[in-house]
């Protein structure tokens, strides 16, 4: 059984930890609001750019000289997975959730006989994935020293991916990140970057439903410039979603830690009081017994 001094020290230690977790929760809450606003502001732009890209792609055929970033290499053998996670921990299962999602994708591709390469963005993703797939990680990018994610950070990553594609290092590139839904809900998401996804175009307003678009100088030239920028925009959105998700997960984790610390303090205080009461009772019995002996 721990002594009164040990219990007192443990109570003081847990109280100090509780102060830290409470402060971290408040900091995460303050950062969450800004991060959430940034992520929500980026969504319409990235979604609309995808729709514009799909519209232009409909007007281009291979014979028109469509960019290889849209048409692909014609093969589906080498896959590059760009896995975006946080730079720091203490955010519950946020990082492990994304890494697990990417790991499942790796296993599926390997089972199909594909060659997999991994590009990690964020220290935690690298730390998790290197335990099992160190030989597959060919590139890593850390943003630990970046105070606020900017488009230039995403653009650097996008240009590096395009350079790797131009060098023939992969055929398909897929982006993995966590889409922010709420403080307690972040959804692991996979988005194909290369070849550029030109899926269904978003529904247009009735006034524009039958619109005919003309492109200058020509659709292929526009795509040549637009697709690289779209890749950077989608990466930028993913990074912003990740920051919002990380702050939400961190706030939730620190709130749980603060409440758990409070419960532990109550239990330790109860043990301290019981032991102190037992010690006082014992001393009183000894005093009374000594008085009776006299």
From Swiss-Prot:
It is found in: Cell inner membrane. The keyword Membrane applies. GO terms for biological process: proton motive force-driven plasma membrane ATP synthesis. The keyword NADP does not apply. Its main location: membrane. Keywords: ATP synthesis, Cell inner membrane, Cell membrane, CF(1), Hydrogen ion transport, Ion transport, Membrane, Transport. It is a peripheral membrane protein. GO terms for molecular function: ATP binding; proton-transporting ATP synthase activity, rotational mechanism. GO terms for cellular component: plasma membrane; proton-transporting ATP synthase complex. It holds the Pfam family ATP-synt. HAMAP family: ATP_synth_gamma_bact. F-type ATPases have 2 components, CF(1) - the catalytic core - and CF(0) - the membrane proton channel. CF(1) has five subunits: alpha(3), beta(3), gamma(1), delta(1), epsilon(1). CF(0) has three main subunits: a, b and c. Belongs to the ATPase gamma chain family. Produces ATP from ADP in the presence of a proton gradient across the membrane. The gamma chain is believed to be important in regulating ATPase activity and the flow of protons through the CF(0) complex. This is ATP synthase gamma chain. It comes from Rhizobium leguminosarum bv. trifolii (strain WSM2304). The lineage of its organism: Bacteria, Pseudomonadati, Pseudomonadota, Alphaproteobacteria, Hyphomicrobiales.
